[in-house]
Amino acid sequence: MEASEGIVLGIDIGGSHITLALVNMDTQSIIEHSYYRTYLNSRAKLEPIIDIWANAINNVFAKEQVEYKRIGMAMPGPFDYEAGISYIKDNKKYDALYGQNIKNILAHRLKIDTSQIRMFNDAACFLQGEVFAGAAKNYSKAIGITLGTGLGTAILSNGVARDANLWSSDFKDAKAEDYISSRWFAKRYFELSGINLLDVRALSDIAAESPVARAVFKEFSENLTLFIKQFIEAEQPEVVVLGGNITKAAAWYMPAVSRTLKRYGIDIPVHISDLKENAALLGAASCWQNNSKILAV
């Protein structure tokens, strides 16, 4: 077993799951046998959600002799991360958490002090994880973009990651998330084909044989390129790191993104995260290293 002094529990709260792992802060790595993931109904009432979270946390801590439990949680917003209060609503997930002090409720359920739980924005945790042990490790200024059910954005400056909150920024004739998310893929493919597909993975699976699927990926590459270009021009980073489930289909859009960025004269490296979901876990845990380097915004 690992020595407990350098161990922190990192948690990533997703729209349909909770993923957890103990992190060895000395080696900046996940303790592999501690990794745990379980699915949940984020439309459920408060108590069942907290029950699943608490049971998962206790399950993972039971795998190691950890005398003092420290928890770092990567949470979607809007959320008062310092106080621990959720303001998520009208988003078809976690509405039951709205207005509740989740930090207090969870600490009570776990029988620990609230000071043992730290909560941060999930996109900022992703980028901080990449700084802690990934593609942004040797950079002082970076931007992170998570591509999934929604659009997450974060900025790293002087070693501090913060939520950029660009999902709702003006983009084309709507908001950025309307064009850069798995929801856009489903909507656009249906508009062009009249067929409902479950997710981006399903679209990727048929892209080799489907001109319509390839057309959707081409259009997405144009949207993503424009968004990255605008983000780079605004923040002037040294590196861009992309994560999220949509990056699993990167072969169908990233070559076009890279070519077009070069045509714009942008030669900043754009990396797909090697840490994948582990980035958020590592980033959430890293908030306990020499005080937090993630702004709770």
Question: Each predicted region: which residue ranges?
Answer:
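Conserved phosphate-binding loops in N-terminal lobes of ATP-dependent enzymes
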Residues: A3-E5, L9-M75
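Short beta-strand segments
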Residues: D12, G72-P76, F120, G144-G150
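Adenine-nucleotide phosphate-binding core of ATP-dependent small-molecule kinases
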Residues: T38-V66, K175, A186-P255, P269-A280
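Glycine-rich phosphate-binding loop and adjoining helix at the ATP-binding site
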Residues: R43, E47-D51, R70-I71, G77-Y139, ...
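Short, hydrophobic alpha-helical segments
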Residues: F61, A285-V297
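Charged, glycine-enriched surface loops/patches
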Residues: R259-I272, L281, K293-L295
